[in-house]
């Protein structure tokens, strides 16, 4: 028996995550763009980027933990990096086989915090989120949506690349993880194939029609364009060297735009 549709439906019911994100954008106006990247702390991505895969669930889990926590808890600016480092620890405990040593995390933060501060922040964040770390990230939906799209390696790589470009982008907080995943696949299809109609199969399994994906997809196209000019509001340095190497081999890393459907430009 195929339970995939039931699983996707269950994950989509966890709509509370969009409430966290909207609160975050409304209540934390000082955490915009560059500051948002500082909180995420791009240096801590090195832990995940050692792994040779297209996409890492721990990486997205860390960012979602940060955003959910900041949506409901006031933190002074000097403690923002501590939030990022501690979120890495929590994400690894939940998603990864290998968990970083606290002393190593202190080194990542240039010894700005003590071991006690990291452990106290871990306790605060876990209690604030009520130990609920199971809310879905785009990674949860990506594999299933790619299967529905009958993806090949090229489509898979570029879809994950589109998602990674969005990880540090403040304005993408408003979208549900399922919509980000579906939009990334739709955008990748437009890039690789000029334009291919969003199939009924994809619409059925993702729950989104083409019109519902256009706004999100257009933003992904804009990030793709800006990545090649160095004008990205966040930073592409969080992308793993493995990811960049794979996408470069496709010839699409920073070329995006020429093959897009005119509706996306």
Swiss-Prot record:
- Which keywords appear in this protein's UniProt record, sorted alphabetically? Cell cycle, Cell division, Cyclin
> What InterPro entries does the record tag this protein with?
Cyclin, Cyclin-like_dom, Cyclin-like_sf, Cyclin_C-dom, Cyclin_N
Pfam families in the record, alphabetically? Cyclin_C, Cyclin_N
Q: Which PANTHER family match?
A: CYCLINS
What Gene Ontology terms for biological process does this UniProt record contain? cell division
Signal peptide segment: none
Q: Which gene encodes it?
A: CYCB2-5
Its domain of life? Eukaryota
**Name of the protein:** Cyclin-B2-5
Stated family: Belongs to the cyclin family. Cyclin AB subfamily.
